[in-house]
Swiss-Prot record:
Organism: Bordetella pertussis (strain Tohama I / ATCC BAA-589 / NCTC 13251)
Entry superkingdom: Bacteria
Name the record gives this protein: Methionine import ATP-binding protein MetN
InterPro entries: AAA+_ATPase, ABC_transporter-like_ATP-bd, ABC_transporter-like_CS, ACT-like_dom_sf, MetN_ABC, MetN_ABC_transporter-like, NIL_domain, P-loop_NTPase
Primary location: membrane
Disulfide bonds: none
Residues the entry annotates as binding ATP: G38, P39, S40, G41, A42, G43, K44, S45
Amino acid sequence: MIHIENLSKTYATPHGRFEALRGINLHIQQGEVFGIIGPSGAGKSTLVQCINLLERPDQGSIAIGGQALVGLGEAQLRNQRRRIGMVFQGFNLLARRTVYGNVALPLEIAGVARAEIPARVERLLALVGLEHLRDRYPSQISGGQKQRVGIARALANDPDVLLSDEATSALDPETTHNILALLRDINRKTGVTVVMITHQMEVVREICDRVAVLSHGEVVELGSTREVFAAPRHEVTRAMVSAATASDLSEATLAAVKQRIDALAAAEPGRAVRLWRLSLKGVAAGEPLWSDLAREFALDVSLVQARVEDIQGVAVGTLFVLAQGAPHAVKDALAALAAREITVEEIAHEPATDRSAYHVAA
């Protein structure tokens, strides 16, 4: 559906050239909900502006439904933009138009026959659950209701793609949940491809099928939402997942575990002591891992911290365990975990923000 190849965008600033996007490659499939996430300054907004060519990339190509956009003239581009609906963070509703009037506006601009507009607007208002507020003005409705108007307006021309640029970041958690449920429902009913631009990992967890993580203008991680939450690879992704799930060790806990490791190592110098982070998903998240490790490899295994989340119907778990045993047994246990497709990281003694870790299995 959306094919982005080698996309780059540079801006001139008083301090020199700034590379907002660098070599972006993304293939977004028809009908999926795709998340683009990253911290502030990662290039998310620039990317969404390039997708609908509000910003022209310096190099690279963008195609939607097989139609290349970069080389189009203004008239052709206007027609193609009607295939792309846009939902904004700030609603951008016209204060002097009613809910009905705001939804009707893009149809009027597109030159839809007057006789056709009422039925199309009523259908859209029913789709977003606002038919009872059709005659209200923006000042008379809530933030969540305003965003529903924005979604209906974005769908007015029956687009193939719906771009959501931080559409929930100004909303409270309950309203955010309701808006995301609405977007998912619209996606299922209409088949529209939804691209979610967000800095909120909670949004990705709730609605997105796949996610791309941006950092400093580059895609640093790409995968299904379940995979990214279960085993984030890049440090930016790890930090965002940890913040969203509280799945990392606190500084105080890590310091206490370090003291325990030192004490165990001093008490039994011939035995290896390791702190592991295990990332599991699906059936593996419910398996009795530490009892298996203790029985099969004669390891003493204690649970430091555990968290299991439901990510779109799949259990995704993060476990921190302290393992002690003969060095060869520890090595064999790591191999056994790898065979179960469990990601294992050995946590060094440094604080969590600076610690070194390595992937034993992915």
